[in-house]
Design a protein with these regions (language model features):
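Beta-rich nucleic-acid/ligand-interaction surfaces
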Residues: 267-275, 350-355
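Generic alpha-helical secondary structure signal
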Residues: 242-246, 321-329, 468
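Histidine-centered divalent-metal-coordination microenvironment in nucleic-acid enzymes
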Residues: 226-232, 270-286, 373
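Structured alpha-helical segments in the cores of large, soluble enzyme domains
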Residues: 214-219, 244, 248-252, 296-302
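Helical scaffold of the NTase/Pol beta-like nucleotidyltransferase catalytic core
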Residues: 200-205, 233-260
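Catalytic or ion-translocation cores adjacent to nucleophile or general acid/base/metal-coordination motifs
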Residues: 252-272, 281-339
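Active-site microenvironments that recognize anionic phosphate/pyrophosphate groups
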Residues: 5-230, 234-237, 308-310, 325-328, ...
Length: 498
């Protein structure tokens, strides 16, 4: 903790100046805003005067750390991650442009170049600490080659874990239904609480997608470069139909330098939020894009490739957007009623639909390209969490739904693995006893296998083994396996399309 006994007022005055200079330098405020923003900040901290001074440049993280420590020392907040996050968002809001200013700047830049507009918006999201880059930089990431190509792995450390006291306090906090969910447009400017993150630095850009109003924002956790979310202005559930595909293509027409996709609309094979219609996009090269074709067809000027990929995928490529849309709709509607009981694929049971798709759209030169990934969410006694879902022998690494991002070959693995994998390395190296770590019990069977393997570098070895596990998880999620039986089944389905 910083010692505030001496000159604390002068130190805070300096930090406020440094924050204002940071905001000026990064185009968040203009010179005419300086006094206004200074007054917002001194009011926030209960300070009664401010003096402008020449200051040395300082990182935003150092500035915020000082201000948060000051607030803890003064009893404004408790020394917890949640309360600090609520306050530092409130601090940054004092130097944020209003939502209308952001929208107008975006539109002005867009009229010149769509990429300039998204560059501005993404930079603002980073500069404002809405995207907490200092935390995201802690994520562990690596890539290793497998039979399907390079697979990307991340261990996500950007969401801080709450301590028991925070959890207890949050449990006793007043519960509200406003905003209805984390995606609703009403989050813009929301101060947050112990159960809902502050969103005062959150900004959104309205979009017309084929006559429907959506909004563009960036994910505060950016799982990949320029990870954006495009959400419906209304709090309405996810759905999958032709209009979904039309929205994806409309987005790509507006932002051809981005890709976009949608999670499936059913539990188990869908994402974590099914209650609010949304898509995810960004500017990142996913492993799936390099997948090779096993078989190729042509249908009404559309090239159709059956991909060599763990999840069963048909890739549609054409200069004609309408032809791709028509064929994608036909694939989806046919798949929704298609069954192949020999491969455990049953479309409907007791009036409940099990088949759906995960669609992904991108531009490749002048051509439209759409990946249609076939999904099924059936459960059985043997597989109560899903037949085409990570199986129990892999849950020690990944047990969550395989959503859009994982479908494309980017693993988002839980933070616990950072510590657990390091402990396993120590055990493999003979520097620790496996049974002295209770949290490793879930890895016991895997560890027994790892002990039988030969390797020269334990770090590289463990990365490769984690990659193998993730690939196995993706293969579990594929409705048609990449073997003779599976490919024959896949071909039978494709033949029903023409």
């Amino acid at each position: 903790m910083i010692d505030f006994v001496c000159m604390e007022g002068e130190q805070m005055n300096t930090k406020i100046n440094q924050l204002l200079e940071y905001a000026l330098k990064n185009g968040m405020i203009e010179e005419y805003d300086y006094d206004y923003c200074a007054n917002l900040l001194i009011d926030l901290f209960g300070i009664y005067e401010f003096k402008r001074e020449q200051v040395e440049e300082c990182s935003i993280y150092e500035i915020l750390e000082f201000m948060l420590d000051y607030a803890v020392e003064k009893g404004m907040i408790q020394d917890t991650v949640t309360e600090k996050d609520l306050l530092d968002t409130r601090i940054m809001n004092c130097v944020m442009p209003r939502p209308s200013e952001v929208v107008n700047t975006f539109k002005s830049l867009y009229s010149l170049n769509p990429k300039s507009a998204t560059d501005y918006f993404y930079k603002l999201s980073m500069d404002s600490n809405y995207i907490r880059k200092s935390r995201i930089d802690k994520n562990i990431s690596f890539a290793h080659f497998c039979k399907y190509g390079d697979i990307q792995i991340t261990i996500n450390l950007s969401k801080p874990e709450k301590d028991p006291k925070e959890i207890a306090k949050a449990k006793n906090a007043v519960s509200t239904s406003y905003p209805a969910c984390l995606l609703c447009k009403e989050n813009v400017g929301f101060a947050g609480n112990l159960n809902h993150p502050a969103r005062q630095t959150h900004r959104i850009i309205p979009l017309d997608l084929n006559g429907h109003t959506y909004n563009l924002q960036y994910s505060p956790y950016v799982y990949y470069n320029e990870h954006c979310i495009v959400f419906n202005s209304e709090h309405t559930p996810m759905k999958m139909d032709r209009s979904t595909f039309e929205h994806l293509f409309a987005f790509i027409d507006k932002f051809p330098h981005y890709m976009i996709g949608s999670n499936a609309d059913l539990p188990i094979v869908g994402g974590s939020i099914l209650s609010h219609d949304h898509y995810q996009g960004g500017r990142h090269h996913f492993p799936m894009e390099d997948a090779k074709a096993v078989k190729s067809y042509t249908y009404k000027d559309v090239q159709v490739d059956m991909l060599y990929w763990p999840l069963s995928t048909l890739r549609l490529t054409s200069e004609s957007k309408e032809n791709v849309l028509d064929l994608a709709t036909k694939i989806f509607e046919t798949w929704c009623t298609y069954s192949d009981e020999s491969l455990d694929i049953i479309a409907n049971e007791d009036g409940v639909r099990h088949n759906t798709v995960t669609p992904i759209v991108r531009k490749v030169g002048d051509k439209y390209q759409m990946d249609v990934v076939l999904r099924n969410n059936r459960t059985t006694e043997e597989y109560p969490l899903g037949i085409f879902h990570p199986h129990s022998e892999h849950h020690h690494i990944k047990k969550e739904n395989i959503g859009l991002i994982e479908v494309m070959g980017l693993a988002i693995l839980p933070a616990r693995l950072k510590t657990e994998l390091e402990e396993i390395k120590l055990c493999l190296s003979g520097k620790a006893d496996f049974y002295s770590y209770p949290e490793l019990e879930k890895h016991k069977e895997w560890y027994e296998y790892l002990k039988t393997c030969s390797y020269t570098n334990v770090d590289t070895f463990m990365e490769m083994e984690v990659t193998k596990k993730f690939v196995s998880v993706l293969e579990n999620a594929g409705v048609y396996k990449m073997d003779d039986e599976g490919m024959d089944g896949f071909s039978r389905f494709v033949k029903t399309l023409w």
